[in-house]
Amino acid sequence: MGESSALQSILYGRGALRLLDQRKLPLEEVYVDVKDSADGWNAIRDMVVRGAPAIAIAAALSLAVEVNDHNFIGTPAEAASFVSKKLEYLVSSRPTAVNLSDAATKLQNLVSTTAETAKDAKSIFQVFIEAAETMLVDDVADNKAIGLHGAEFLQRQLGSSKNISVLTHCNTGSLATAGYGTALGVIRALHSGGVLEKAFCTETRPFNQGSRLTAFELVHDKIPATLIADSAAAALMNNGQVQAVIVGADRIAANGDTANKIGTYNLSIAAKHHGVQFYVAAPVTSIDLSLPSGKQIVIEERSPKELLNSEGGLGKQVAASGISVWNPAFDVTPADLITAIITEKGVITKSDPDGTFDIKSFIECAK
C-alpha cells in the first residue's frame, strides 16, 4: 500500500512494515523491519523515518503490525486500553509534530467508542488496523491535492505561467509522507505543469535533510534543482533568483504561527526583507487549534552530537571537546511573515483589513 512510485519511505502490507532508513540516504537504500510499537518508537526517535505526516503513519502502522497477530486475552475495553497506552507511548517519540498526537487522539477515540459495542478484543484490533491503513492511503491523496492547490495559487499570485523558481527547506516530499509530499508536492505539481524553472533546496543542517533527502528526491524525479548552503539563502533572494519560498510544517497554531525545521524562521525573515512570497504547505492535520499561538508549541531539542560530529552526529567529531551545544530541532515562524497556508482543502489566506489568518473558520467551512 502507499504511493506507487519507486521512491517510498513506507512499505506496508497487513502484518508487515518496512521503513526506508533515511539516515543512510542518498548513498544506501536500506529498509528496516518494524515488528511492533517499540520498533516504531525507536525508528521515529532515531530518525529512521521523519517528516510529520510520515511519523504519524509509521507510528500507527507499527502498532497495527503488533496487534495483527496478537493473542490478546481480555475484554474489548481492555483491548482499547491496550491500544490507547501504546499510542501514548508512540507520541512520546517526537513531541513537536502535531500529526502524531492528533492521529493518536483520533485512534484512541475510535477504539474507545468501538469497545462500547464490540463482542471481543479482536474486533477492536481489526478496527484499529483498518483505520491505520486508511491513514496511509489518504495521505497520498491529500498531498496531491496540496500540490494542485499550491501550484494554481502560486501562478495566480506571481502572475506567471512559466519560469517560476522556488526555494524549499528540509525535506517535505515522498520521504516525509506516504508519497508525493507537501511543500515538495507543490514543486512537483509546478514541474509537471511545465511552469517550474528551478527548485533551490537548502542543505538543512545539522541533520542535512535537504542535501541528503530533498536533493535525492529532486534528482530522482529529474526536477531541475540546485543545492545551496543554509547561509546562502538571503544572498539567493537578494540576487532575485527565487519568487517564492515553500516550506512544510510540523505544527500550525490557531493564529498561523508555524513550527517547522530549524532555520525556517531565518528564511521567513529574509523573504520578508526581499519581498519574496513565503508559503507553508501542510495537511489540516498539522493544524492545532488548541494552541492560540506558537508560544505554546513544545520545541524538541536533539542530541549535541548532531552538531559536535559530522554527518548530523553520525560521523567523526569536528567540534572542540567541552563546547556546550544548543540544538533545537524546530523554530516557530510568526504568522505575520507567512503569505498563505496551502492545505488539501484549499489555501488559507489572510483576511482584510487586519491581515490575520482565520484558520478556525476555514476548517469549519471545509468540513
Curated annotation (Swiss-Prot):
Site annotation (Transition state stabilizer): which residues? C170
One GO term in the molecular function aspect is: S-methyl-5-thioribose-1-phosphate isomerase activity
- GO biological process terms held by the UniProt record: L-methionine salvage from methylthioadenosine
Q: In which pathway does it act?
A: Amino-acid biosynthesis; L-methionine biosynthesis via salvage pathway; L-methionine from S-methyl-5-thio-alpha-D-ribose 1-phosphate: step 1/6
State the UniProt keywords alphabetically. Amino-acid biosynthesis, Cytoplasm, Isomerase, Methionine biosynthesis, Nucleus
Q: Which domain of life is it from?
A: Eukaryota
- Which interval of the chain is the signal sequence? none
Cellular localisation: Cytoplasm; Nucleus
Q: Looking at its record, which EC class is this enzyme?
A: isomerase
What triggers or suppresses the expression of this protein?
By iron deficiency in roots.
Q: Which residues form the active site?
A: D250
GO CC, alphabetical: cytoplasm; nucleus
Q: Pfam families in the record, alphabetically? A: IF-2B (PF01008)
EC assignment: the record states 5.3.1.23
Catalytic activity of the protein: 5-(methylsulfanyl)-alpha-D-ribose 1-phosphate = 5-(methylsulfanyl)-D-ribulose 1-phosphate
Q: Which family does it belong to?
A: Belongs to the eIF-2B alpha/beta/delta subunits family. MtnA subfamily.
What is the protein's known function?
Catalyzes the interconversion of methylthioribose-1-phosphate (MTR-1-P) into methylthioribulose-1-phosphate (MTRu-1-P).
Record PANTHER family: METHYLTHIORIBOSE-1-PHOSPHATE ISOMERASE
Q: What's the name of the protein? A: Methylthioribose-1-phosphate isomerase
